[in-house]
């Protein structure tokens, strides 16, 4: 077998009959499989041992040779080679066909490759192949031309003879008629008798004429057909063909079935055809040119590569190894077999029957019928159901053919090559483990013992607890006490991987150090739940064990959960306190007026109280019950850094540890600040979730990851501790209904009644009534909410939970205690009947019914969304899987401009709200210079929060940053253009698979995006706004948007004309060019609102000035139009902006760079318009890099470069158009991709990840990249010196570790003795 790590590319091509025979180890001649009595394979059958190898190791069929010592001998009795049985997985056989057959992929695929090659319509091809028509394969033009006059004379003679015969017959008949009439005349017969006789005679004469005419016409048809006879001409009429064959058989050759196709291909001159097609493309027009282009693609493929088109017609069919199509005995003596065996048997049966018929010399019609059946059986074997009715097995189930084994989710590619099962793994339910550190997980003892079994057994033998592995295994199975001690030792420092399905992003698998726990559930650290999207309501997780030292190192360094605190999508921490922890910290840092031990200033006779000399003293007071954690106190602090403003005021030279200052705060806040790293400024605020998030963000920017991990761990512990102390619980008594509710509802009820009356009287139409009612009840709900808010006490547990940001929101509180309000129907419109009850009071039957309406829609939506979002992720991964960081810097000068802030009219700067996802974590492309010309931040610097603050302070509003959109690296991207890796906070490493990270970052929040298209309700018939997931798909698939808005092709003034249904907009260009007219723009799409020069916003009106690319109506611009009008850079920025709008609407933060990676892949290709002196075909798609390289080469040689136009491809199309045929085939349309790749003899350079996973190589990303693969360890000087010192002769000198290791034991029979001879 080939070692996969030693080849660089994989080529696919057409196999010729000779190739098939070379692969084969023998011909399969019989359809038999296994002898049902002996259960041994039949000789020459589909499982024959002579062809495919022995069924048992080192044993021939007849049993003459048994044992490994006869290795390689071929038994003279049964002809079976003595070898391992596993050769039955790799040895192929073949079936010699009695008549050639065509390969269905090439004739039936769309477009038909055979049809394009031979220039035959698929319908005609089908007629020829399935014996419904003859085709002329060759014509001897010269011979026909030379002898045409002779043949014509012969034909004239034949015609003359027929005409003479006719004339003579007519003459004779006329005379007979005359004689008959005369006789009747003499007898004095009646006139009607005479008439009958005359009519009869005339009818016969007419028949004579017609018969002769038919014969003459037939001769004429034969003659004209013969004179115009040309190769590839179809003759459907069998009699005509026979006649031609009899008369002019020596001048032409014709046939039907695959044999005729084979002859046509043999006679086909590829070079001449390619030349003539190129000529047609240069000079032709319209349909003719288009067809020539399509045909040239196929013809040129055979012209340039080593493939012969003869491979599309088969003389032999390969038989795959029997172990790949096994036959298994079930209990009860029956057999289960792979469908392929049935399909092969049909082929063999028909083939054998055809051979017999040919030997017998059966009539042609019978032989042809059998050949047609053979063709159909081979078609079914290759691709069942592609043509006609599929071959079915028992129960009318279509049999799975070779193509079906590759296709789809259950096919070879996706089931076995891209998704494999792994050993050393287990799964169990998860429970929370609040006592764990961030990098730990609790592993149940039993599971750990099973996972680490081999390690434990080896260690037991090493420690002499067991004599050999077998007894060690027995000890483990009986769970002896020593086993647990050894397990503790083995498990130490050996990380395990935990994974929760669905793994939507890379944080779905993380490494932890296992801690043994009792019970059978895995314990999970509460802070990693966010990343795994896990909760403890019965979720399960899988455990995997990294075995090799390299795998363990990677798990520990790259995948340990404490090294994965930041989200790869936004670069912000994911391991944040949530739920209980937030509540606990919120409780701890709340300040309550008048609480026990509060600070009171000195009065006349009272000294001041609530002043403490140190936190320790305050804690003593707390322990004695003289102070509450939430009371305001004054305390002298020396170990905590003062806030920035106090530090600036009190310590102008900077604060040092031990400098004292007094804080007016609560003990709780002091305790909270003690959890933060030393030197972090004191935070004197109430900690709701937003503030906690901001602090952890800040920590992640300023401190090393290890400090952040320790801090969040401390916050977790404190959060749980104080949440327990706070006593926050929820009971029915905490749900308070506002007393004013009834009065509010009665007031609005009256308003609603008056609207209803107006509707009854016909003053309002239905839509207006609905709109008015919706408005009334929305106001009512709002007012009940206000009443609720003012009615609740501050310390109410529900309010505490909501205000702290732990979970829930005010709407939910209002639903519980106030009123539910209006709900929507499945269309997304409001039902104008409100739900007036709260859940505390209980809903009426009608209210409950209305409420279920919306709830059920929600559940159905979620299910659909999950599937859609998963498919979107799959397409994104496929399009971007080969984007890997390949070099440090591509040295480009280019970049994109991002806005940092907007200048207001008064000159102040307002920070751009999207700075987090646009400028943050990028590399500067040029120096950022302020108004005076001072460089604030240098080129090549990373923009973190401090750098952005410095730029804003210097008054800089926009900067030019590096971007993957402008990166100059050929395949993949360079580290500088990509910028900081969001997950590590440092410049991205070479080998990082940024494409996959981008796809996951966009796909993972996909489930949160809403499905529905929103309706702008109301009377004015607004267009649908497509939002959520459908909009993201529409953008990435580069589809024309549903409500497409025209964009201005040129800059200029507009003339707006309105009719009752349409707008007509004319743009008068500034440069005086031709006017651009947009006609028939529907008035349902409103005019676009524009920001005008004076800063006001209003609708587009007559006489306004528009810039090129500006949208004229509401709706979405068509990205293809943007590309045409404004070019590739603008369309990329447009797509990024539009995708971000959808995600931002849902409150999801994703960095622009991820979307840019995908968009870059959508614009990788160029359509060739004019090929110049290059090899490209006009109309074909080419990689931009390849296009530019070829053009440089041609220009250097003084030739004409090719002209191309950038194309925007949707992600599905771009995935299928990738250079890697393995990746494309495993994605979608497997047979089409493979057909195309085989014809073009495609070579896969194995540059992406998928291709390498499929063939089992290490992926070229991360530590699998080439530069990291051959690292050698060089000893340091000290180590070298130590190696030459004289060893001391102590006990360990004789230990087995001494000296050169002898390596693993080698089985004797594999050992080569050649060196010793």
Swiss-Prot record:
GO MF term set: DNA binding; DNA-directed RNA polymerase activity; magnesium ion binding; zinc ion binding
Protein EC: 2.7.7.6
GO terms classed as biological process: DNA-templated transcription
Keywords: DNA-directed RNA polymerase, Magnesium, Metal-binding, Nucleotidyltransferase, Transcription, Transferase, Zinc
List of residues binding Mg(2+): 535, 537, 539
Binding annotation for Zn(2+) 2: 890, 967, 974, 977
Positions contributing to Zn(2+) 1 binding: 60, 62, 75, 78
Keyword presence, Transport: no
One Pfam family hit: RNA_pol_Rpb1_2
Reaction(s) the record says it catalyses: RNA(n) + a ribonucleoside 5'-triphosphate = RNA(n+1) + diphosphate
Disulphide linkage map: none
Note describing how the cofactor binds: Binds 1 Mg(2+) ion per subunit. Binds 2 Zn(2+) ions per subunit.
PANTHER family to which the protein is assigned, alphabetical: DNA-DIRECTED RNA POLYMERASE, DNA-DIRECTED RNA POLYMERASE SUBUNIT BETA
UniProt record similarity statement: Belongs to the RNA polymerase beta' chain family.
General function of this protein: DNA-dependent RNA polymerase catalyzes the transcription of DNA into RNA using the four ribonucleoside triphosphates as substrates.
Annotated protein name in UniProt: DNA-directed RNA polymerase subunit beta'
